[in-house]
Amino acid sequence: MTQDVVTVSSQTAGTIKESGTHSNPDNKTTSPSTWKSLSKYACFDSEAERQWWNDSGALIARFLDIAKGDIHEQYQYLLFVREVVIPALGPYPPIRRCCINITEIGIELSLNYQGPGKPVFRVSLDPISEMSGTPMDPLNIDTVNDTVARLASIGLKDFDRTLHYHFMSEFCMPEEKAKTYQQDSREPMAWSQMILGFDFKDGNVVTKEYIWTRHAAHASGLHPHAIIRRAISRVDDQMRCSAAVNLVLEYMETFNADIPVPFFSWDLIDPSESRLKLYGIAWQWSWAKVEEVCTLGGKLQGPATDRSIGLLRKLWGILKLDEFTPSMAFTWNYEILPGQTHPNVRIYFAICDRSDEEVAQAVSQWFNLLGWHETARSYPETLRYLQPNRDLKKTNTAHTWLSITVTEKGVYTSLYYHPLGNGPDDHNIRKTWF
């Protein structure tokens, strides 16, 4: 990581102010009282932490305000962010070394709408330490391990490290191989192999973990799917998901053989309760590909699948995806619940290729289609509240992705956002992430 290290100079230090000082028409200031209160006597271990708190910390406080949790929950969540997330973000300005979003910054923010009520706020985190990317921790495994240990010490409700240890033992290569991985694989940068995710819901923090498969495949010489099958077989007595996993992998091997499952995720809870999500990507953007993914190449049929395809086709039209090809890869995941024989499908639409104002109007149109009329009406103003420093007619990265899952229980829409309130709006599209 030496080539990517960013030093905060004395000229930079102390110049970052809270991200947003305006008020919106509903008289909500862009600096919630929760953030101001926790900032008053805050002590940080470094100038970088202070600047992260003043930028992304203030932005996160606005997201928590949008999520409409009670004041006690907002304080608890912000304290978690300050104590766990902020220290794991590394230098400020940020190192551009992460593959969880188009900004290459190691934090991603999202809102999950499960109906017309309040959304669930979520954070994805690629922790950074002084060892990250160095020969001491080339694939960032030790740094993630330390963060998971810290989470365990906090005493999060239902937190369980069983699957963390299991999948780490199955996919993380020996230390000596890890030290030479970047050179041996000829990758331009040694991305982290594991990242974390947090859902702030019902007063609790639910933790998820993601792992990339190509590192283990390169080190072992095995196909990524062979390692996935082996790893799942060893915990299937608890997760009860092998039938659905095999269905997904067979589809991928038939229709997407050039790009095997690049990463997958699970919940850090008891394995018998954990979901498993297998991700796929393709550089082919077409409606035919969406239908193929949603039906597993024709193997998934029925009213629920038909409804999903019908709604996705309408969203495809709202986003005008017949008129241009997004610069990001087409992405999806298959979510498998314990005991489930067929997965739920989530489709991700890249929305960073047009103005944020245009995207906000499209999101409003989508919410109206679902009957969430108040959420639809307020969404453009919600975005201006979250990002008051952007001219939304000119910027195009306040949003990054929009994802949809349609199940028998309802329609779930997630929107993913730029993690900075003050930072530069530029981003580079890498086709070598996976």
From Swiss-Prot:
Substrate binds at R122, K208, R275, K277, Y279, Y348. Pfam families: Trp_DMAT (PF11991). Pathway: Secondary metabolite biosynthesis; Alkaloid biosynthesis; Mycotoxin biosynthesis. The gene is penG. One of its GO terms (molecular function) is transferase activity, transferring alkyl or aryl (other than methyl) groups. Residues 1-35 are annotated as: Disordered. L-tryptophan binds at E104, I105, E108. Residues 1-14, 21-35 have a biased composition (Polar residues). Prenyltransferase; part of the gene cluster that mediates the biosynthesis of penigequinolones, potent insecticidal alkaloids that contain a highly modified 10-carbon prenyl group. The first stage is catalyzed by the nonribosomal peptide synthetase penN that condenses anthranilic acid and O-methyl-L-tyrosine to produce 4'-methoxycyclopeptin. 4'-methoxycyclopeptin is then converted to 4'-methoxydehydrocyclopeptin by the ketoglutarate-dependent dioxygenase penM through dehydrogenation to form a double bond between C-alpha and C-beta of the O-methyltyrosine side chain. It catalyses: yaequinolone E + dimethylallyl diphosphate + H2O = [(1'E)-3'-hydroxy-3',7'-dimethylocta-1',6'-dien-1'-yl]-quinolinone B + diphosphate. CDD domains: PT-DMATS_CymD. Belongs to the tryptophan dimethylallyltransferase family. It is an enzyme of class 2 (transferase). This is Prenyltransferase penG. Its EC number is 2.5.1.-. Keywords: Transferase. NCBIfam families: arom_pren_DMATS. InterPro entries: Aro_prenylTrfase, Aro_prenylTrfase_DMATS, DMATS-type_fun. One of its GO terms (biological process) is alkaloid metabolic process.
